[in-house]
Amino acid sequence: MAADVSVTHRPPLSPEAEAEAETPETVDRRAPEQELPPLDPEEIRKRLEHTERQFRNRRKILIRGLPGDVTNQEVHDLLSDYELKYCFVDKYKGTAFVTLLNGEQAEAAINTFHQSRLRERELSVQLQPTDALLCVANLPPSLTQAQFEELVRPFGSLERCFLVYSERTGHSKGYGFAEYMKKDSAARAKSDLLGKPLGPRTLYVHWTDAGQLTPALLHSRCLCVDHLPPGFSDVDALRRALSVVYTPTFCQLACGQDGQLKGFAVLEYETAEMAEAAQERADGQALGDSHLRVSFCAPGPPGRSMLAALIAAQATALNRGKGLLPEPNLLQLLNNLGPSASLQLLLNPLLHGGASGKQGLLGAPPAMPLLSGPALSTALLQLALQSQSQNQSQGQKKPGILGDSPLGTLQAGAQPSNSLLGELSAGGGLAPELPPRRGKPQPLLPPLLGPSGGDREPMGLGPPATQLTPPPAPVGLRGSNHRGLPKDSGPLPTPPGVSLLGEPPKDYRIPLNPYLNLHSLLPSSNLAGKETRGWGGSGRGRRPAEPPLPSPAVPGGGSGSNNGNKAFQMKSRLLSPIASNRLPPEPGLPDSYGFDYPTDVGPRRLFSHPREPTLGAHGPSRHKMSPPPSSFNEPRSGGGSGGPLSHFYSGSPTSYFTSGLQAGLKQSHLNKAVGSSPMGSSEGLLGLGPGPNGHSHLLKTPLGGQKRSFSHLLPSPEPSPEGSYVGQHSQGLGGHYADSYLKRKRIF
């Protein structure tokens, strides 16, 4: 009734002023956000009773002072007159947590057993303190109790849930309380509901101390005023506007730490009844070009504390769904991403935006593709993009697994050293329309999709060069053998190449892939010394040509005990026209390990595959020869073929599945099946052939010096104790390679 008296008798207003306030002009100037119809007294009574019942519905009690040996059954017997929903006894602390049917039973149990005795020990019974009570404020006044329960129920089991109504009008004051069974449910509800838009309002959620919440403190004394005019900063004008009924004890505009206005203000009145009368009068009042919206704050804290809490809640609501750091702009994103990722981000809408109808960062996509092929357009745009960020990339480039960054080697205005399909390898036998190229850097990886050596020259692609041994691959992906070699007598300077996979250490020269655009994957440099020591002719473009060694001519398909040796010499002559002074041709020696091979060719034996030296004239001819000669079926126990052939096959694993002579047979027939000569594709992904003078590079076991030059490569396995035979019960290459690898790994 105090609220009615204060509203009826308004000391600051005279009857004339009150009449003036009720004039249509003044009424028209008020535009509250929601006009609620008046309620009948019965509805008001029901709402108030529900709020009081829910407020008192604290049914959890805490019993202290229990004996140390008390049991759960004793507590049930003690509270036998009540309906227990939950009971937990802590014997170490002598306490019991009990949940009864409702708040009335809890109040009755407290009145009955508080300060009573159990086994000569005095008990203390009281309500359990709760830390899972939330106050949800800034609700729409038209929100019903059922809608409020539906809003807060999804986050966990509710202990209490009620709205706070005006005792005079019965309308909601725009805030309510929700208590959960568990604190984590309340924390989840606070996190999800804070800043959530509900109709025209944004929810504010606060923790509430249930111990300090009384029926009198359910009603708030603070008001929140928003919808202020833009840039409004006159606190005195706001105070006068809301002092028509009662003068507030606290009035302040919200400002951030940077001094920026937040667009709302907080006012505090002496009593909850004064605050209710001021809210009813000022809600929708015109101030400047805006109509104020006045709502109740959460009850409890004073006005100054509530202002700080609302500022923090507004900042949290504005940052809802965002990270702790500000969102980076497009320029920062492109700078942090690599050139390839930035290019893909920019090109995807252009290349594929026509189907989706969306415009990308570069605008609407063209009606036709930029270039005839996506690979060509990507490469050209990548070069253009890199030329713009040259200074940045040079300061940040770091060597990767395969060496320096490929983008860091681009120079401004430099042209690519090869076409998108790669450069052809140097050597004789090129087609007339393709002149031989000399001194080109050679990538480490072999041609994966290129045709075999026997088919390259008819196609006009020219013969490839030697490659280091990569991991094994399917038969259809094997590369070509080492054939046509340059006959020039002087080195030529080579421009630095660009690789898509990075630049490796600077001491490799290997052949180039004409199909996968892997030009200069490993740049060429510092191989002058190693090329003369049996690198399979990889450095022949930088040495003066030497006369080839004389070798007897071998008829194609020859047989006999010396056919293998002759074929070996013939192949060495055809493959290696440039002889080495340090590798005299001695194919008949039984111990091929005596040759002066470099110690750093050991890693080439990894996954290596021997050539077929007994194939006779199936060498680098352009013809598809018929099946292998009869020398395949002859034993190699003596004679001229016993020396190099036995060593060539005994210690050379050919692949994961075959070894020795069986691999040569299978390799020959597989290559014949795919339309290439056996010798033409015998050295692809799975193998390497003999060196410049016909001696296999596979004869050399890696020595200790290998660690200094090629410590980053896997060591090669020792020669298999089973030789070239792999039978049904043979251990095979896999087990032997694992054993030898473990033994050699201990050396490093």
From Swiss-Prot:
Keyword Cytoplasm (UniProt) = yes
Q: Which PANTHER family match?
A: OS02G0815200 PROTEIN, RRM DOMAIN-CONTAINING PROTEIN
Which residues does the annotated region (Interaction with PTBP1) include? Answer: 307-401
Phosphothreonine is found on: T469
Q: Which Gene3D superfamilies match?
A: 3.30.70.330
Q: Which tissues and organs express this gene's product?
A: Ubiquitous.
Source species of the chain = Mus musculus (Mouse)
Q: Which GO terms describe its molecular function?
A: RNA binding
Q: Tell me the disulfide pairings in this chain.
A: none
Tell me the SUPFAM superfamilies matching this sequence: RNA-binding domain, RBD
Q: Give a yes or no for keyword Nucleus in this entry.
A: yes
State the UniProt keywords alphabetically: Acetylation, Cytoplasm, Nucleus, Phosphoprotein, Repeat, RNA-binding
Motif Nuclear localization signal per record, residues: 45-60, 743-746
Chain residue ranges for the region called Disordered: 1-45, 390-505, 525-647, 672-731
One GO CC annotation: cytoplasm
Residues modified as Phosphoserine are S6, S14, S480, S576, S626, S630, S716, S720
Role of this protein: Cooperates with PTBP1 to modulate regulated alternative splicing events. Promotes exon skipping. Cooperates with PTBP1 to modulate switching between mutually exclusive exons during maturation of the TPM1 pre-mRNA.
Segments of skewed composition (Low complexity) = 675-685
* Cell compartments where the protein resides: Nucleus; Cytoplasm
| Taxonomy, superkingdom | Eukaryota
Residue spans making up a coiled coil are none
The UniProt record lists the RRM domain at 59-130, 132-210, 221-299
| Assembly with partners or alone | Interacts with PTBP1, RAVER2, VCL and ACTN1. Part of a complex containing RAVER1, VCL and ACTN1.
Q: What is this protein called?
A: Ribonucleoprotein PTB-binding 1
Q: Which residues carry this modification: N-acetylalanine?
A: A2
